[in-house]
Each structure stands twice: as structure tokens, then as C-alpha cells.
């Protein structure tokens, strides 16, 4: 394997041996594709011999760089399969932790345990020896905390539920140790975070690893600290991928005051919009459904106000909406504003359960369905159990595509793997293999489109990337079998496996 640490000063490069061949110029743009690529190569240029299939650079329209960074600092619980395994990981971490140190982890999923029952604070009290513990669930919508963590946050029997969240309680009313939605606000100030230099180092490592799985572009949903670190990497010419940033809704006022608009930045780092939560998640049983279940995190008056403010600021809006009730409310609110300004392209993030009657509203609202195919594999049994027959409307990529709804695919990493090849397989072949509503699957061309041109369109970049055509940025994901052999951005190799110049 070879990696390139700096990404400027592109050399005209001819990528051959793959299908199709591609020639890039000194500016990182495509000059020619296919049989004409070699004939068009003149003057000084480099030749790189590849094998396999050259795709437009694959993108991820929904990822969390900040959470991927923090995952490297705490307990990674994604592979734990039971309450016992989680507690053993906490117990092991506590052996080397100071008495007052926080133990933080991410990734537990009680729905996948042999006995799928929610845990409580007393388990953590024993495993951590009284230390404060905070363990975010796989979907990041619930948190499992110890008694000392509750005490430090000032959460008691008398503490009311947040307006957009739930504090689970024991029979006598004391907090059980499970909090759903809105937990970040309650604990954010006390959780340890890395210093600026350490954060940038970890962020650079995360981004490098994303290039290794074939990603050329990612859209991240992150706090302002991540944008600061990304700017620093960009200034040092250490940002190999294209990164599109969507800021949290509580940063909208600051963005307005600074005059940050959709498209602020350049081809490698730009701001697209604001991310806000309509509801919770399936895993935490907080997805807002048309039957009245779940949690509505933003009421209609606040939603309409948010839309107006985003329109005024010329910042796009990415609305997290998983349940069919949340999706319905979002689309109804967005519908009157279609075409309000040229780059107004609101997005419904996740869109996991769409009532068929709301599919035409996507078109009337000009909304993009930003979806993550791997969620379907993880959530299949849970969707059948919680949603019943309504699961026939879940992860309905094929139905949305047939109706003409723009699709942009991603992973929601670290909730799911960021590997786009796994996502492609989930979107195309998995449903037929397991017999789960196979009519909702996609053809390979449509799925590839959602990972390439769809990702570009969801950030207003469809005239510059997402296709292998002259004048477009030379972003390639080269695949042989089920393996990525090379990732190219701006005509420059950022990852290669066993490559040799011709």
C-alpha cells in the first residue's frame, strides 16, 4: 500500500489498466475518458497502472467526523454482543482510570443482545467502581450513565424531562440511567475532549482511513470545532478528501452573524447548511410516527421559524427525520418554499420510514432523500418488531427512486461502517438475498448514482464531480472484485493498493 501525505501540485496523470482509462490535467480535471485518454496524453505526464473498474469517486452524504474522532479516545462498543460484554469493557477501563475520571464509550445496542432489555445505572456503578460513566448507544440517540454521572449533571428524581427528550425512570421516579434524545446538552460541558492539536491529528487519521475505503467526498454533520480543525488541515494542505460541513442548528445565529452562506469555502472544504432534528431513532424507540408514538424534537412553530431563518441566511437545511410522522411534518413545512433561491435544496436525513402518500411531497418540496442503506441490514428485525406492517415502507430506496426523488447515499458512520461497497451491496442485492421487501431494492446504476452524482447534487457540486466526464474533477474510486484498489481526488492518488507505475 502507498499513501500520499500532501495533495497539491498535481501532475497530469494517465490512469490505465482500469475500465475506463482516465486522463487528468495539472489542475486535477478530467481531460479524456476511455479509448481517447491515451491518445490525449501529451507532454509530461505520469502513468499509473491499475486494474478493475474505475468509478466516479464515491461519496458519503451523511457522516459524523467528530464522533469518529471521539470513538478513538473512548470505548468502542460496536462489537459487544451483550450487557455482560459492555460491563466487562467498562470494568477493564476502570482498572487504569483515576477515581474521578470519566469513562466514555459508544456503540452499545441492547436490541441485539440475547436478552434485549434496557440496562440501568446500578450495573455501571458496580463495574466502574463509582466513577462517572457515559455510554452512547449505537444510534447516539440514547445514553446509559452511572449514578455519579447523573449526580454531576444535577439530574435527580425532581428533574423534569427535557422538552425534546425523555429521562427513563425507576418505579419510584429516580432516573434509571437511560436518557433518550437531548442528552448531549445535559452532559456536554463535563465530558473530556482532546486538545486542539490532538483533535486535528485524530481527525487527519480518520479522514485518511475514509480514503482507504474508497471515499472521495464526505458530508459531515458536526460542531464548529470540527470545522475549525478542518480549516487548519486545509491550510496545511493535509485535507485529501472533499468535505462538506453541515452545522448544528444552535450555530445558525453565529453563522448568520458571520455571513456564512451555502457554498462558503472551496472545492475541498465548504459549508452547505444547518442540521436539525425532527425526531429520534428507531433503535431508541423515539422515531416520530404517524400513529402518535415517538418523540417530536421540534414543534411546528419552531420548525417554520427555522426554515425562515435558513432561507434568510441562504443556508440549506438538513432535517433528521426517521419516522413517517416526522417526515410528513418536515415535507409539509418545506413544500411552500420550493425554489426560494437557486441553491435551496433541503434534505431529509435518513428518511427511514416514508408513508407512500408523502412521496409526491418530496418532489413538491424539492427535497433530497439522504439515506443510508446499511441501516436496513442493522434494523431489519427491529423494524419488523416495532413498526410491524409499516416496515413495508421502510428504507424504500426503490420506491423513492421510481418516483423521481433525488437520492444521496451515505453511512451515518460511526453508526454504520463507512465502507461504500458494503452500502452498495445493501442497496442492490441484500434485500433479494434475505427476502425482505425486495421490490424496494435499487438497480446497480441507480445505487451508484446515489453514491456519486447524488452526493454531489446534495451539496450543489453536480457540475464539478460525480461523473467521469471531461471538465469534471478527476475523482476516482477504483474497484477490483470486492476491494478498493485506489482512490484518486483531483487527479492525485490518495490511496493505492499494490500499484506500480507503467
Name the predicted role of every residue range:
Residues 1-39, 87, 91-96, 200-212, ...:
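Active-site microenvironment of metallo-dependent hydrolases
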Residues 228-234, 255-260, 327-339, 361:
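Distinct, well-ordered alpha-helical segments
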Amino acid at each position: 500500500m502507498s499513501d500520499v501525505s500532501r495533495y497539491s501540485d498535481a501532475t497530469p496523470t494517465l490512469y490505465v489498466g482500469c475500465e475506463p482509462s482516465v486522463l487528468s490535467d495539472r489542475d486535477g480535471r478530467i481531460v479524456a475518458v476511455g479509448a481517447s485518454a491515451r491518445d490525449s496524453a501529451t507532454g509530461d505526464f505520469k502513468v499509473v497502472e491499475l486494474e478493475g473498474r474505475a468509478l466516479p469517486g464515491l461519496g458519503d452524504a451523511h457522516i459524523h467526523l467528530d464522533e469518529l474522532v471521539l470513538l478513538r479516545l473512548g470505548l468502542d462498543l460496536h462489537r459487544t454482543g451483550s450487557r455482560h460484554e459492555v460491563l466487562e469493557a467498562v470494568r477493564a477501563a476502570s482498572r487504569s482510570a483515576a477515581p474521578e475520571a470519566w469513562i466514555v464509550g459508544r456503540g452499545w445496542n441492547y436490541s441485539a443482545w440475547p436478552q434485549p432489555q434496557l440496562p440501568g445505572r446500578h450495573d455501571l456503578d458496580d463495574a466502574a467502581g463509582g466513577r462517572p460513566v457515559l455510554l452512547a448507544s449505537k444510534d447516539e440517540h440514547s445514553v446509559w450513565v452511572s449514578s455519579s454521572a447523573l449526580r454531576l449533571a444535577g439530574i435527580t428524581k425532581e428533574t423534569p424531562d427535557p422538552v425534546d427528550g425523555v429521562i427513563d425512570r425507576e418505579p419510584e421516579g429516580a432516573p434509571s440511567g437511560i436518557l433518550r434524545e437531548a442528552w448531549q446538552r445535559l452532559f456536554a460541558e463535563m465530558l473530556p475532549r482532546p486538545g486542539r492539536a490532538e483533535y486535528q491529528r485524530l481527525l487527519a487519521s480518520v479522514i485518511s482511513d475514509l480514503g482507504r475505503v474508497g471515499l472521495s467526498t464526505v458530508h459531515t454533520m458536526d460542531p464548529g470545532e470540527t470545522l475549525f480543525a478542518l480549516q487548519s488541515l486545509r491550510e496545511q494542505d493535509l485535507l485529501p478528501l472533499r468535505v462538506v460541513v453541515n452545522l448544528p442548528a444552535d450555530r445558525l445565529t453565529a453563522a448568520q452573524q458571520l455571513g456564512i452562506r451555502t457554498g462558503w469555502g472551496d472545492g475541498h472544504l465548504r459549508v452547505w447548511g444547518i442540521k436539525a432534528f425532527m425526531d429520534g431513532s428507531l433503535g431508541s424507540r423515539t422515531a416520530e410516527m404517524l400513529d402518535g408514538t415517538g418523540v417530536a424534537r421540534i414543534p411546528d412553530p419552531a420548525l417554520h421559524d427555522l426554515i425562515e431563518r435558513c432561507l434568510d441566511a441562504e443556508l440549506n437545511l438538513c432535517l433528521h427525520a426517521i419516522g413517517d410522522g416526522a417526515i410528513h411534518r418536515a415535507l409539509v413545512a418545506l413544500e411552500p418554499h420550493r425554489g426560494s433561491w437557486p441553491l435551496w435544496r433541503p434534505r431529509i436525513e435518513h428518511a427511514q420510514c416514508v408513508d407512500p402518500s408523502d412521496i409526491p411531497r418530496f418532489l413538491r418540496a424539492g427535497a433530497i432523500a439522504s439515506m443510508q442503506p446499511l441501516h436496513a441490514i442493522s434494523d431489519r428485525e427491529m423494524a419488523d418488531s416495532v413498526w410491524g406492517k409499516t416496515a413495508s415502507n421502510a428504507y424504500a430506496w426503490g420506491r423513492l427512486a421510481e418516483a423521481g426523488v433525488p437520492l444521496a447515499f451515505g453511512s451515518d458512520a460511526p453508526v454504520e461502517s463507512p465502507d461504500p461497497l458494503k452500502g452498495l451491496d445493501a442497496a442492490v442485492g441484500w434485500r433479494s438475498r434475505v427476502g425482505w421487501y425486495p421490490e424496494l431494492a435499487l438497480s446497480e446504476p441507480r445505487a451508484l448514482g446515489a453514491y456519486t452524482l447524488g452526493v454531489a447534487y446534495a451539496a450543489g457540486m453536480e457540475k464539478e464531480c460525480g461523473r467521469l466526464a471531461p471538465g469534471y474533477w478527476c475523482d476516482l474510486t477504483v474497484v477490483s472484485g470486492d476491494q478498493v484498489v485506489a482512490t484518486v481526488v483531483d487527479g492525485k492518488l490518495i490511496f493505492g493498493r499494490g500499484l506500480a507505475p507503467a
